[in-house]
Amino acid sequence: MHQSHSILTVCFVASLLIVAIIERPSQGAEPVPVMNKDRAAAFARLALKGLGKEYPNKLDHVLSGPADVKSPLALHPVFYGSYDWHSSVHGHWMLVRLLRLFPDMIEATEIRHVLGGHLTAENVTAEVAYFGRKESKPFERPYGWAWLLKLAEELNGWDDPDGKVWAKNLRPLADIVVSRYLEFFPKQTYPIRTGVHPNTAFGLTFAHDYGQSVGDARLVRLVDERARAYFGADADAPAGWEPSGADFFSPTLIEADLMRRVLPSGEFPTWLSRFLPGAAKGQPHSLFEPATVTDRTDPQLVHLDGLNLSRAWCMRSIASALPADDPARGALELAAARHSHAGLEHVASGDYAGEHWLASFAVYLLTTAPAK
C-alpha cells in the first residue's frame, strides 16, 4: 500500500509540474506558451524515464523463423525504449533539441550520457542491418522514417563535439531511410489520409524538411512532386468528419501543413481557401475546437491529446504562411492557442500510455518557429 501511494504521489507531482509551468489563457486571445528551462527539464525527465525502459514494448516485427524471436534491445539497440521504435526515435530527437536550446540545464549530463550510450556506431549498424531484412521493407513507414530524419536533421544542425559524433554515427541509418523514400513513394499511387502513423502527408512533411536542411535535391523534388500529385487538386476537405476516435493528426491540417511548404507563397492561400473554405469562420467547429479525451490510460484514446498538440502546430504554421490580412489567419491563430493549452495540460498524465510520447509533440510545438 505504501509503495502504491508513493507511485501515485510521484505521478501527481509530475502532472502538477507540467501544468504549473503553462500560462493560463487570458480573457481575449490566448497566448501560446513558450519554452523555458523549467518546461525543458520537465519534458526531458519524461523522455529520460522512458528511453532506457525496455518493457512494456510494442514491437512491429515480422518473424521469418524461430531465430527472429528476440528482445527489443537485441533487435533495436538504439531505439528499444519508450514503448515502441518511433516513440524512442522522437524521444531522442526531443532530448537533442532541448540540449541544444538549454545546454546548461540540470539534466544535460544525463542526457549526454543516454544519447552517447545509444547513438554509437555499433548500435546504429545493428539498426541498419534490421532495415536491411527483406521483412523490414515497410517497417515504420512513413511515421518512424519521418522522425528518424527529423532526429538526423537536428543532429546535423548542431555545432557540438558530441553532436557531430552522433550525427556521423546516425548518417548510415538516415541514408537508408532516404533511399526508402525514393524507392517507395513513386510507387504509392494514392495517399493514405488517416490520422495516425501511416499518414502520407506527415511522412512527406519531415522528409521535405530534412531534404532542404541537407541539400538533398532528389528528396525535395520527390516530396514536391508527390505532394502535388496527391493533394494539389484537393477541395472542400471533409474536415467535419474529424476527429476520428484515435487520431493524433488531423488529416486536413497535416495536409495543409505539407502544402504550405511545397506551394509558392502566392499560391498557397488560394489552395487553402479552396481546400478549407470555412476556415475564416472557424468552421467546421469540430476541427477548430480541441478534442475531448475521456481516458488517458487507454493507449488509443490518449492519442487525442497528441491531436490537440499537432493541430496547434499545424494551425500556427498554416496561419503564418498566409498574408496578414487573410481572414482565415486570425481564426487559425486563436484555434492554435486553444489547442496548445488543451494539449499541454495533459502531457504528464501519470500514465505511460501518454507519457512515453506526448512530450515530443509538446516540444515540437513549443520550439518550432512558425512559417514565414
Question: Where are the regions that the model predicts?
Answer:
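N-terminal secretory signal peptides that target proteins for export/translocation
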Residues: 1-6
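Bacterial N-terminal signal peptides
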Residues: 9-20
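Bacterial Sec-dependent signal peptides at the C-terminal "C-region" and cleavage site
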Residues: 18-31
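Low-complexity, Ser/Thr/Pro/Gly-enriched N-terminal "stalk/linker" regions
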Residues: 30-80
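Solvent-exposed loop and edge beta-strand segments that line ligand/cofactor-binding
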Residues: 31-37, 73-89, 129-146, 187-200, ...
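Well-ordered alpha-helical scaffold segments within catalytic/enzyme domains
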Residues: 31-35, 45, 49, 89-105, ...
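Extended ligand-binding groove/face enriched in aromatic
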Residues: 74-77, 89, 98-211
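Long, repeat-rich segments with strong aromatic
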Residues: 212-353
